[in-house]
Amino acid sequence: MDYKDTLNLPKTSFSMRANLVRKEPEQLKKWEEMDLYKYVQKNREGAPLFVLHDGPPYANGNIHVGTALNKILKDFIIKYKTMQGYNAPYIPGWDTHGLPIEHRVASELGEKAKELSKSTIRKKCRKYAEKYVKIQREQFKRLGVRGDWENPYLTFDPKYEASVLKVLSKLVKSGNVYRTLKPIYWCTSCETALAEAEVEYHDHKSYSIYVKFQDKNKPNRFFVIWTTTPWTLPANVAIALNPNFDYCEVKVKDEIWILAEGLLEQAMKAMGIESYEIISTKKGSEFEGEVAQHPFMNRDSVIVMADYVALDAGTGCVHTAPGHGEEDYGTGLRYRLPVISPVNDQGIFTKEAGKYAGLFVFDANPIIVEDLRKSGHLVGEGKIEHSYPHCWRCKNPVIFRATEQWFIDVDKNDLRQKALSEIEKTEWHPSWGQNRITAMVQDRPDWCISRQRSWGIPIPAFRCQDCGESILDGKVIDHFAGIVEEKGTDVWFEWSESDLLPEGYTCPKCGSKNLKKQEDILDVWVDSGSSFEAVVKVMDELRFPADVYIEGSDQHRGWFQSSLLLSVGTEGVAPFKSVITHGFINDEQGRKMSKSLGNAVDPQEINNKYGAEILRLWVASSNYQEDIRISMNIIQQQIENYKKIRNTLRYLLGNLSDYSPQDSVPYEELLELDKWAIMKLHKLIRDVTRYYDRYEFYKVFQSILKFIITDMSAFYLDIIKDRLYVEGKTSPERRSAQTVLFEILVALNKMLAPILTFTSEEVYAHLPEAARNYKTIQVENWPEYKEEYIDSSLEERWEKLINLREDVLKALEIARAEKLIGNSLDAKVTLQIRSKDIDEIVRQYSREFIADLFIVSQVEFAESVEGFNGEYAVVKVDRAEGEKCQRCWKYSIETGADPELPDMCPRCVAVLRKYGSDYEL
């Protein structure tokens, strides 16, 4: 007879196959129809506020896997905090100004770009940015990220631009903004100044030359310098020595050369000089004020002192050109040296460079070297591969060039020290982030905030045509900000000066009305760095300072730092209470993603092939505080992990199809094994909550997966299967298990909800109506950890039983391999327990209970047994005694004792006698 209809087999419409690629868009549509973001916010009205402020991605191209990682991490935090009872708004934003967009637009326009007005270029840039905001918005939504997508913040929005100008105005009024001629990074290809955050370092092959400068007063004496930038020699005005180093006067043939003693041997070897003699040694300070002759310009080169001169390379005599170097410039200020920078915006030498006028600086290198060789000033040459700054956008090498620019003085009003103090008050995850940004802020130069481009917020500066004064006045900025709020910044390039200036405004220096607007724009890091003012302070649903900023580790010198300096400079405090940093993404071998290696992974491809849920699981499984690895192989591993999670959720649902929360059994009446499972669940809730609080999502993932695989699938669910399927449908034994399964399902689904946002919603829809308080799981309350369920003696006892079970499972596996048994229920095991502790525990339970624990038909105990030699017991496996029950498949010598049910064991007979009305027999 087929007894299938008398068993409580799992039943659920929750499918085994996830079909994520089809189901996820359907879920997105449901969320859209219910206006998910508004619904969640309405249900958290009046709750404590938690503000994660979105660092704006750049509106240029499709999202890549790094952008996806960032947005998914933010979504984990927002969804967890919401379920924790917080009102956690999420206003996504986009960085929409700047060189990358202008560069793309110019590339598309080709030669035509040069003929167009700035106003026209700006309109095309806006259109380009708008296009990619729309594209990226859909791509982020596809990842399951919840946010106010209909009302994002955009840095080209007039109100946002006006807020940025207000930040600038405050800094101008406090005296933190100045204009000067100073060497800065300059991209000759993009024709603009660059900030440190816009420079990338790549390996670059450079000249390495040694040049002698003749002493003007002692014609046979020479200062020997070393440089890797021959093109900067036309701007040389000095040679720097360290006042504290010893310098040797060395005889080489008939000449006396001056070099640092600590570099003498190394330098002579590099120059190929084998024969030389040290004549005398002096401190560097003794040479101060001496004068050398420039090797090819009709100009003096003064000997100056500088503490930064080091003994790591070169000669200890450092070629100094204040127009082409930050340290050189500082030395030039101290010695009042001229700042010469004979290079135009395109990197072409001007007539000030003499015979090299008209040459591109890097093209001039070999010519200058050859001229030095011919004149006899070149005493050594070679090539060196070293780390050199390149433009972040066009990837070409940049130069250091002195130009007139606007700067934020990071030391005025103790801005640097205040920023360092705020860094100390901020919580950094991981903790090394604090040291990293501290070092960067300590060592950073003043911030060059002007750019010579079109697409950005104009700096509302004017130049007086009568006295030449550059004017950047807080009153003028405030007036212009008022216009911008209504009209946007395009008006700067379209309106006349009289329309842009406050009525009756005159030059503060000479009183002239003859003022001409300047066309520099603000560094985009000022745009995005002002978001604390333009978004966090302005929006009613947010609060300043924000609780969390989370971005990639490159933002220590980017958005974290620009936001910090601007906020401290205008508000006196950091814009964030804590900062989370994530690493970069590499391939499986730890190599950087690149087109040339063909190892880039496209998030859209993963979404379309496997579903966004798999990408989200990959993010959760990765320790994002380090560099993270991804490949299709790694994605396949996450597909397997997803299946394990989904199958467990499905199994739980299947065994609860006839259960309602009102059927629950009180804790005191639960079976002991069920109490153990509840305890394990609550330990998981405790640990997972702690990991979410610390933003350690990979530990959340590991803990949940271990719980599912080890505690549930391999142990608890395996053991209770018999009780669930075979005991009476409404029996206390089965209801005890179901009570626990229900609590596990609800709590587990909630703990997974921030990560598996689509799957948890699908599970939620399959829960009994009484267990669903909202239209979405995203508003449910986080599972509550209950200390009273933690019983250390119970845990200790069961740990020993589990250890014994491991020995039995190994013995059963051997018996199965030897074809002694097929299913474990075919077995009877006899145990010789070695451990007195375990023996005492086992004796407290019935043999039937222990047999159920091992999933065998019978258990016996003996003083001496021959069999598998386990760690805790010797285990002998035999064929079970008696006949197989056709309902539960256990063997019993009493099977068939009831003539009415001749192929059933007494337990199954009793179940059907008592609960027969529950089944269709």
UniProtKB/Swiss-Prot annotation:
Motif annotated as 'HIGH' region, chain positions: 57-67
Q: Which UniProt keywords apply?
A: Aminoacyl-tRNA synthetase, ATP-binding, Cytoplasm, Ligase, Metal-binding, Nucleotide-binding, Protein biosynthesis, Zinc
Catalysis performed (reactions): tRNA(Ile) + L-isoleucine + ATP = L-isoleucyl-tRNA(Ile) + AMP + diphosphate
List residues binding ATP.
K595
Tell me which cofactor or cofactors this protein depends on. Answer: Zn(2+)
* Enzyme class name: ligase
Q: Name one GO biological process term.
A: isoleucyl-tRNA aminoacylation
Motif ('KMSKS' region) on chain: 592-596
Q: Name one GO molecular function term.
A: isoleucine-tRNA ligase activity
Q: Which residues bind Zn(2+)?
A: C885, C888, C905, C908
Q: Which GO terms describe its cellular component?
A: cytosol
Q: Identify the InterPro entries for this entry.
A: aa-tRNA-synth_I_CS, aa-tRNA-synth_Ia, Anticodon_Ile_BEm, Ile-tRNA-ligase, Ile-tRNA-ligase_type1, Ile-tRNA_ligase, M/V/L/I-tRNA-synth_anticd-bd, Rossmann-like_a/b/a_fold
UniProt cross-references to PANTHER family, sorted A to Z: ISOLEUCINE--TRNA LIGASE, MITOCHONDRIAL (PTHR42765:SF1), SOLEUCYL-TRNA SYNTHETASE (PTHR42765)
* Subunit-structure text: Monomer.
Free-text comment about domains: IleRS has two distinct active sites: one for aminoacylation and one for editing. The misactivated valine is translocated from the active site to the editing site, which sterically excludes the correctly activated isoleucine. The single editing site contains two valyl binding pockets, one specific for each substrate (Val-AMP or Val-tRNA(Ile)).
Role according to the record: Catalyzes the attachment of isoleucine to tRNA(Ile). As IleRS can inadvertently accommodate and process structurally similar amino acids such as valine, to avoid such errors it has two additional distinct tRNA(Ile)-dependent editing activities. One activity is designated as 'pretransfer' editing and involves the hydrolysis of activated Val-AMP. The other activity is designated 'posttransfer' editing and involves deacylation of mischarged Val-tRNA(Ile).
Q: What is this protein called?
A: Isoleucine--tRNA ligase
